[in-house]
């Protein structure tokens, strides 16, 4: 069996991603963890934080089989395009951010890594740098030639997956088609089985409209699209309940009897999850041929370099990736 090792991308270099990597390196890890970033950036940020971390250089040809000792971090050096001023965005480094993601993602495809864990990027500055970018999820789908991926966040026993992700609200209803809903539901079900080890996943499905459309008086998407699609999938044996009004679904009566929730759009499902577990939640991309988890927060430019940050979400992202790799092996 191939040794398990994992890639870690710090994301936006001016944000807290480098800080998280360094603080994490002070704790022992069960598997080799390779930060794909600039060695100079980590050296600079460690000095700002007052953290003593030994940086151990590796290349694709010299990847380790054993975890680094606590207080050490493996680094696959990736050069910056411009010096980093902590807390200050610089569009000149947009391509650098994407290069780290490409190295990690391609490394997973090539079998160098068992999975990748990503710290937050800043979508705006990447686009300002002249590169069209809507998020990790979409970028990795393109890199891996995956037609459909699913964004899921989890904290504790609550998992919330999304039918649509980063769309303006006015475009959401048109994006919810029977084909998309069926593909997303199948991916969610399959990955709950294959990557999370849940033999018979129970999935609750939100309606799109208030009161799940109120029998068509507040919208017909539930009647025309959602219910017929769910019924077709139920006939194949999938355990699906819904469409349910979101404000009813997200109550203990329902959540106690499900393994995942499928929400129709970003701000329908994620506020509840983040209220329950912000700082202790993980973002998982389902449907990829690789394992990818991420933190549940942003770049926190104002906290970068201060050591006043919580590594909780990154630790959960790491633990989730480890567990998924163990289940999937």
From Swiss-Prot:
Subcellular locations according to the entry: Cytoplasm
Record-stated family: Belongs to the PdxA family.
First-tier enzyme category under EC: oxidoreductase
GO (cellular component) term, any one: cytoplasm
Catalysed reactions, semicolon-separated: 4-(phosphooxy)-L-threonine + NAD(+) = 3-amino-2-oxopropyl phosphate + CO2 + NADH
Residue positions binding substrate: 136-137, 274, 283, 292
GO terms, molecular function: 4-hydroxythreonine-4-phosphate dehydrogenase activity; cobalt ion binding; magnesium ion binding; NAD binding; zinc ion binding
Source organism, top-level taxon: Bacteria
Alphabetical UniProt keywords: Cobalt, Cytoplasm, Magnesium, Metal-binding, NAD, NADP, Oxidoreductase, Pyridoxine biosynthesis, Zinc
Stated role: Catalyzes the NAD(P)-dependent oxidation of 4-(phosphooxy)-L-threonine (HTP) into 2-amino-3-oxo-4-(phosphooxy)butyric acid which spontaneously decarboxylates to form 3-amino-2-oxopropyl phosphate (AHAP).
CC cofactor: Zn(2+); Mg(2+); Co(2+)
Note: The active site is located at the dimer interface.
Residues where a divalent metal cation binds: 166, 211, 266
Pfam families linked: PdxA
Pathway: Cofactor biosynthesis; pyridoxine 5'-phosphate biosynthesis; pyridoxine 5'-phosphate from D-erythrose 4-phosphate: step 4/5
Chief location bin: cytoplasm
SUPFAM superfamilies for this protein: Isocitrate/Isopropylmalate dehydrogenase-like
Signal peptide annotation: none
Free-text cofactor note: Binds 1 divalent metal cation per subunit. Can use ions such as Zn(2+), Mg(2+) or Co(2+).
PANTHER family reported for this sequence: 4-HYDROXYTHREONINE-4-PHOSPHATE DEHYDROGENASE
Record-level GO BP terms: pyridoxal phosphate biosynthetic process; pyridoxine biosynthetic process
Identification of the protein by name: 4-hydroxythreonine-4-phosphate dehydrogenase
Subunit architecture: Homodimer.
Gene name as annotated: pdxA
InterPro entries tied to this protein: PdxA, PdxA_fam
EC number: 1.1.1.262
